[in-house]
């Protein structure tokens, strides 16, 4: 910015004993600092400056674009699990943006230029499209004046209409198989689109969290006890579900076979346990146990 030369933001945070980073997910981008309470005003001032006065040149974009390309090569192109995950999401979601990787496809990254970046920045980086999160030994009485001082004076940006994409119903099964010479341990999973806190039949989100814990949430889950302990055909087995997604979430099952165990046999065993839950339901003891484990994990 006009107030901070390249690198001065990070240097200021480090000089004051703090740490900083940023990340992008499917639903949001976050910038954060961990720093002493008496330096809170400093980082709020720096972030407000970054939100409104960012300067980017083509000369700066080129090396950073190369960094992102290299990150993609390292984390995706050279990682069979990540390759499969990309292909899986592209097949699982017919229309929702989750079918596209967060980091982007290689040709998309290569096409980014300073005009693309500044256009996105000017449209999205504004107080009316941001959430300020502060945690630690600070009160609202201390925080609110700082928020008003640094963010309250920033003009609202363009009003962004939230046009949420609708995912159409699936009409056919989709099965993916990825074979790679670097894979030393095969794995299997099955995934279903499911409601989240924000999408679809949201009233089911809490129940699905408990169900995931019962079926495959750890050593006491049905899948682990049956496939890993009793039948000894899997090295691991479980279920997963995340209700936080803005769009449709995924409820899934996974298993890693023991050496010599056929993948088809493993799939039948997993789905036999799932079918049992669909047919007979779960017990009150399983529900209370799952809730207690989830509460303990949240502390």
Question: Which ranges hold each PLM region?
Answer:
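Active-site recognition of the HExxH zinc-binding catalytic motif
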Residues: 1, 221
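M16 family metallopeptidases and their MPP-like homologs
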Residues: 5-51, 81-107, 129-135, 186-197, ...
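An aromatic/glycine/proline-enriched structural segment found at the starts
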Residues: 94, 102, 127, 131-198, ...
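Conserved, carboxylate-rich catalytic/transport cores that coordinate ions
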Residues: 121
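Zinc-dependent metallopeptidase catalytic helix centered on the HExxH motif
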Residues: 205-206
